[in-house]
């Protein structure tokens, strides 16, 4: 896996790669979702920063996704999960803030269009896979601009986390803001946290978020850190996107075991959220999981559906 990097939303420049000499302002990318255009195609493209392992057979892959959610002990469920043709995301409304359920749904609803617009801006240029993290950054900035407008109407402090994964020319590209996160089940049965040991919170053991979509009253001066990561797509991979109601209650070893034991994404996602809600008892949070399997497809490449969504 390629090392994750932190970028900054909120007008701070995005370094496109060591030695590239290129920098793109977040302000130049912060387009409302309803007004996304292909204008970014005229910007200088980032240099290639890494190599992918065998992308020649990318069309032979099929991704099967499923999601489950449990309300837990909360009165309502402010989590939301979504997946589409080539991407999936999960969002969790900020606890205690107004309209958390609305904000999480806005984030998920906006991400698909934002991701596709970012890819369209790149076009079919050679080496498009190397621009995956750049496209993910663009998508997050666009979603943040959109939900920030909603947040200003819904009430001060409203916002949501967002974690996403997308397939891009043989790679899986991840993005994250807040404490929702992503894991990959390793070949040896261990669980790898895509974003390292960072929990997305200000203090270890605390609940306060370091950043959230649409929420810029932050401890770090108003700059919302976005994390991205990427890795080659491989047959047999299992990816988990989850809210803090999952990882805060279940140890990594148990999550890995549940992903390994339950063969289908639908049963694995259901087992994970049910056990997380039970582990939390009377104080359990909303728990949501999206499980994605990377499989080898036997269909001709021209007839494949990149993602098969199951519930």
Regions found by a protein language model. Name each.
Residues 1-311:
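PP2C/PPM-type serine/threonine phosphatase catalytic domain
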């Amino acid at each position: 896996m390629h090392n994750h990097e932190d970028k900054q939303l909120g007008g701070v420049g995005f370094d496109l790669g060591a030695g590239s000499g290129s920098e793109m302002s977040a302000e130049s990318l912060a387009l409302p979702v309803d007004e996304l255009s292909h204008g970014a195609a005229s910007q200088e493209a980032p240099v290639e920063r890494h190599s992918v392992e065998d992308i020649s057979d990318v069309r032979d892959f099929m991704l099967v996704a499923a999601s489950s959610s449990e309300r837990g002990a909360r009165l309502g469920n402010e989590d939301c999960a979504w997946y589409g043709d080539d991407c999936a995301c999960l969002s969790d409304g900020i606890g205690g803030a107004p309209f958390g359920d609305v904000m999480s749904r806005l984030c998920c609803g906006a991400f698909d269009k934002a991701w596709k617009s970012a890819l369209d801006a790149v076009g079919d240029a050679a080496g498009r896979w190397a621009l995956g993290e750049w496209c993910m950054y663009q998508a997050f900035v666009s979603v943040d601009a959109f939900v920030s407008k909603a947040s200003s109407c819904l009430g001060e402090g409203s916002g949501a986390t967002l974690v996403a994964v997308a397939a891009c020319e043989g790679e899986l590209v991840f993005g994250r803001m807040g404490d929702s996160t992503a894991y990959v089940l390793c070949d040896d049965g261990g669980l790898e946290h895509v974003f390292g040991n960072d929990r997305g919170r200000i203090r270890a053991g605390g609940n306060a978020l370091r950043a959230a979509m649409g929420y810029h009253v932050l401890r770090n001066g108003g700059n919302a850190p976005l994390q991205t990561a990427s890795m080659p797509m491989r047959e047999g991979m299992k990816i988990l996107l989850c809210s803090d109601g999952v990882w805060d209650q279940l140890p990594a070893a148990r999550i890995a075991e549940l992903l390994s034991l339950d063969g289908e994404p639908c049963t694995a996602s259901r087992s994970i959220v049910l056990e997380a809600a039970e582990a939390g008892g009377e104080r359990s949070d909303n728990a949501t999981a999206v499980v994605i399997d990377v499989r080898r497809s036997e269909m001709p490449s021209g007839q494949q559906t990149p993602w098969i969504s199951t519930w």
